[in-house]
């Protein structure tokens, strides 16, 4: 190995990072009330707000990234289903 290639390999270390990810969806949920008018005569429905999902990505090169996603999407389910 020449001196130039030895210096190059020292200045550019091999990329041996490995990543692991942990994901949790709908860790908690919030359900609010019922609405019998929107469902007609088949019974009440409910609005739901999905809970916050947490996504954590850990990089073994001493980098830690944490991403918290708050979903503001509202879903409605009717008692007729």
From Swiss-Prot:
Biased segments, Low complexity type: 9-31
UniProt lineage: Eukaryota, Amoebozoa, Evosea, Eumycetozoa, Dictyostelia
GO BP term (any one): sorocarp development
Family from the record: Belongs to the hssA/B family.
Residue segments, region Disordered: 1-31
Highest taxon of the lineage: Eukaryota
UniProt xrefs under Pfam families: Coiled
Source species: Dictyostelium discoideum (Social amoeba)
Name of the protein: HssA/B-like protein 3
InterPro entries: HssA/B-like_chaperone, HssA/B-related
């Amino acid at each position: 190995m020449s001196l130039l290639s030895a210096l190059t390999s020292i200045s550019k270390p091999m990329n041996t990072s490995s990543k692991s990810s942990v994901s949790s969806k709908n860790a908690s949920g919030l359900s609010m009330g019922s609405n019998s008018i929107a469902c007609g005569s088949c019974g009440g429905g409910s609005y739901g707000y999905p809970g916050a999902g947490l996504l954590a990505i850990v990089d073994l090169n001493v980098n830690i990234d944490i991403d918290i996603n708050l979903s503001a999407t509202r879903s409605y389910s009717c008692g007729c289903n």
